[in-house]
Regions:
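Glycine-rich helix-loop "coupling/hinge" segments at transmembrane-helix boundaries
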Residues: 134-137, 149, 164-165, 214-256, ...
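Generic hydrophobic transmembrane alpha-helix motif, especially the helices
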Residues: 61, 65, 71, 95, ...
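Transmembrane alpha-helix signature in integral membrane proteins
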Residues: 71-103
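Short membrane-interfacial helix/loop motifs at transmembrane-helix boundaries
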Residues: 6, 10, 34-73, 222
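Short cytosolic juxtamembrane segments of multi-pass membrane proteins
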Residues: 266-283
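Membrane-cytosol interface at the C-terminal ends of specific transmembrane alpha-helices
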Residues: 90-91, 98, 102, 140-190, ...
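N-terminal signal-anchor/first transmembrane alpha helix
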Residues: 1-42, 118, 196
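Short helix-to-coil transition segments within interhelical loops
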Residues: 64-69, 107, 176-195, 236
């Protein structure tokens, strides 16, 4: 996209309520996550049993957990861990899925058939169930969570890339590129990818939200981020036995997940409407 087009998208976005609302929520959560890399009110690795389960107050704005750790600090570091896993998983899925989709649409034949059958098999299982099963098979840990969540992102990007690029290969400018002697790989890099980038960005935003949910799910089951590193799913798991006398320990990470997922979905819907006028909805 050139600079003029980016400016038009930005101006359209400022007048789109879903885009603005989603952008504000997403920037808020991303800011907390990034801030945790350089500052948190308290260390999340320091326990203070004497100060456990304190209610929100002047020293601990959101209270403390059953180990005396500051809940706000836990939420901030948990935001980074959850979002980093989700982003890395999207990168893995896109890195494999996009070339698969391009190869299928460019080569057709048995390659296209094999990619489509792989997609059909992958979509036969719910995404979260797939992530949980793969995490259980690979073992607990953030890296294995990235691999597990990334694997269910592969068919998403492969199918979207294939569907978006099929019609482009029949366009006149692609035929002209072939006549000019350009190979398939060069055509994909110079002509196909730039024309489907907007669609891929929108899908990546939606997958980011799903990745946060998936990471929370596998961490809740003890298969994701491991102690002493906090994550929103792990915080929910640890708080479930304390709901009646310390409900904030479960409500706060739950709200963080909801706000992040809601913000990303609103942002994705807004980007879809702005980048694809045919999908624009009346507000």
């Amino acid at each position: 996209m050139d600079r003029k087009r980016l400016q038009e998208i930005w101006e359209d976005g400022l007048h789109h309520r879903s885009f603005v609302a989603g952008g504000i929520l997403t920037v808020l959560m991303l800011s907390l996550a990034i801030l945790s890399l350089i500052w948190t009110p308290y260390s999340v690795f320091t326990m203070n049993i004497a100060g456990k389960l304190q209610p929100p107050g002047e020293l601990h704005w959101l209270g403390t957990d059953h180990f005396g750790r500051d809940v706000l600090s836990m939420l901030m570091v948990g935001a980074w861990n959850s979002m980093a896993v989700s982003l890395a998983a999207i990168g893995l899925g896109a890195l494999i899925g996009i070339p698969l989709g391009l190869t299928a649409s460019a080569r057709k034949g048995w390659i296209d058939e094999a990619v489509m059958r792989f997609n059909d098999f992958a979509f036969a299982f719910p995404a979260l169930l797939t992530a949980v099963m793969l995490s259980a098979a690979l073992g607990p840990g953030s890296f294995n969570s990235i691999v597990a969540i990334g694997i269910f992102n592969i068919p998403v990007f492969a199918r979207l890339t294939r569907g978006s690029s099929l019609s482009l290969f029949q366009r006149d400018f692609i035929l002209a590129a072939r006549i000019a002697g350009k190979g398939t790989t060069r055509i994909c890099a110079e002509h196909i990818l730039p024309n489907i980038t907007s669609v891929l960005i929108v899908q990546a935003t939606i997958q980011f939200a799903l990745g946060i949910l998936a990471e929370a799910g596998v961490s809740y089951l003890g298969l994701g981020t491991q102690p002493p590193q906090p994550s929103w799913g792990k915080m929910l798991s640890e708080a479930q036995t304390m709901m009646f006398f310390a409900p904030n320990l479960a409500i706060l990470p739950g709200c963080a997940i909801v706000i992040s997922v809601l913000g990303l979905n609103l942002l994705g819907d807004g980007m879809r409407d702005i980048l694809d006028p045919k999908m624009r909805t009346r507000e």
